């Protein structure tokens, strides 16, 4: 071999000298190459041994890290394009009007009252004429779902149209909520839902009277209801599917109705009067005006007859700041006491009653809280009621699986959870329960007097 060729080869590959010591980086690169080679061979071998691995879908996709800006932007852009495409697939107002016109044109007499009806044959004809966007609604399954007792085998045009409208609204709302899903995982964090509601406020005529300075308190009040009931494990996020499935969003969007009755506003947690009521109560309790509630200030809540023992447990278990409660924690407290029949509220109160943290209430737990009721009765000049009688009544009402223990599920299943918890934490509630027969008789007498007049 010519010496020139040898020299050229040596200069072209300086690392080929076996005597030369490899650098640390070169060793790492070589190790990585070997690892990749052997791992690929092993992985390929696994695939060859079992063909079913090819059919298993990928179920984990790593989210971009904070420093991976390009990947984050790509993910955001792709999600935005996807949601825009989904939005274009929905029926717009003009297409909905056209659908209504086609349905009305193909109705089949006779009408039932003022309800226009349509049979399956014409139902399919409308589906062909309505266009590709409507295809999903014109199926045998949908027709059968809406078919009730019509002797001609028809369905109500209005019921079908309302079904389509509801579906379109659900998809629109899901897309709207998904725009605030920063992670793109089908969940909304507290800050995500806050942003959604904050941007929704200007579209709700019933909230026009709210001052902008109150917006942050309104948003906090609204968001807490979603998280109190839909996030029982306190993970800090709730599924978009759960938001759509519950009635809270319907209640919130009901505020678009400019002619909403006063009664409806009073019973709607999201209405301006309700939010102002809750916040006003908080301000009235805050006597030292420091923006927080102490145990003494909270003791004046409602009829001011809650026991000190129960209030102690509230401040032991709930999040506080230097022993005082902020507005967000207060909202959880209010939601629990105002909705005692709901499982989420019972879970909140049960945790406070379970002083031994055993997951159940026993005779000791019941006696611990009822003694405080007996003490308040003495202070108010009433004869204390025997604990044994109350204990027997509670166990008779709940009928727990274990005759000596009451679990949270026992309380929920009994449908008496609100009564039991009221008896144990509030003197006024206990007095109302104890005198229920006299109160019912008094109401009947008053009703009879009104009838006589």
Swiss-Prot record:
Keywords: Calcium, Cytoplasm, Metal-binding, Nucleus, Repeat. Ca(2+) binds at residues 286, 288, 290, 292, 297. One of its GO terms (cellular component) is centrosome. Residues 1-27 are annotated as: Disordered. InterPro entries: EF-hand-dom_pair, EF-hand_13, EF_Hand_1_Ca_BS, PPP2R3C. GO terms for biological process: B cell homeostasis; cortical cytoskeleton organization; microtubule cytoskeleton organization; positive regulation of B cell differentiation; regulation of antimicrobial humoral response; regulation of B cell activation; regulation of dephosphorylation; regulation of mitochondrial depolarization. The keyword Magnesium does not apply. The keyword Nucleus applies. Its main location: nucleus. This is Serine/threonine-protein phosphatase 2A regulatory subunit B'' subunit gamma. It comes from Rattus norvegicus. The gene is Ppp2r3c.
């Amino acid at each position: 071999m010519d010496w020139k060729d040898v020299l050229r080869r040596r200069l072209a590959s300086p690392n080929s000298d076996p005597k030369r010591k490899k650098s640390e980086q070169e060793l790492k690169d070589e190790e990585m190459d070997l690892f990749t080679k052997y791992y690929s061979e092993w992985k390929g071998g696994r695939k060859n041994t079992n063909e079913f691995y090819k059919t298993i879908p990928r179920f984990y996709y790593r989210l971009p890290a904070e420093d991976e800006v390009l990947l984050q932007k790509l993910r955001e852009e792709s999600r935005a394009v996807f949601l825009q495409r989904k939005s274009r697939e929905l029926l717009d107002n003009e297409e909905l009007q056209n659908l209504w016109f086609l349905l009305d044109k193909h109705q089949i007499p006779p009408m039932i009252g003022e309800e226009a009806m349509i049979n399956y044959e014409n139902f399919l004809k409308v589906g062909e004429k309505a266009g590709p966007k409507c295809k999903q609604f014109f199926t045998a399954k949908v027709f059968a779902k809406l078919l009730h007792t019509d002797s001609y085998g028809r369905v109500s045009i209005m019921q079908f149209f309302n079904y389509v409208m509801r579906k379109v609204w659900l998809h629109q709302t899901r897309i709207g909520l998904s725009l605030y899903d920063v992670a793109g995982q089908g969940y909304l964090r507290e800050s995500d839902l806050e942003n959604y509601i904050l941007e929704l406020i200007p579209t709700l005529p019933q909230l026009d009277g709210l001052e902008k300075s109150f917006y942050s308190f309104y948003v906090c009040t609204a968001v807490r209801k979603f998280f109190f009931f839909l996030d029982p494990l306190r993970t800090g996020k709730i599924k978009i599917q759960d938001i759509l499935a519950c009635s809270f969003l319907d209640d919130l969007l009901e505020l678009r109705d400019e002619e909403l009755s006063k009664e409806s506003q009073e019973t709607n947690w999201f209405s301006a009067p309700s939010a102002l009521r809750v916040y006003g109560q908080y301000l009235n309790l805050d006597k030292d005006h420091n923006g927080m509630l102490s145990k003494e200030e909270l003791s004046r809540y409602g009829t001011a007859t809650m026991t000190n023992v129960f209030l102690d447990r509230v401040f032991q278990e709930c999040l506080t700041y230097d022993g005082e409660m902020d507005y967000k924690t207060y909202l959880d407290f209010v939601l629990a006491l105002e909705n005692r029949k709901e499982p989420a509220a019972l879970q909140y109160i049960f945790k406070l009653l379970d002083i031994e943290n055993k997951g159940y209430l026993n005779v000791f737990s019941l006696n611990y809280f009822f003694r405080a009721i007996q003490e308040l009765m003495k202070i108010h000049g009433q004869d204390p009621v025997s604990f044994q009688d109350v204990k027997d009544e509670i166990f008779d009402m709940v009928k727990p699986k274990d005759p000596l223990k009451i679990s949270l599920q026992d309380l929920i299943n009994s449908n008496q959870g609100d009564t039991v918890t009221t008896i144990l934490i509030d003197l006024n509630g206990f007095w109302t329960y104890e005198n229920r027969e006299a109160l019912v008789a008094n109401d009947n007498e008053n009703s009879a007097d009104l009838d006589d007049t």
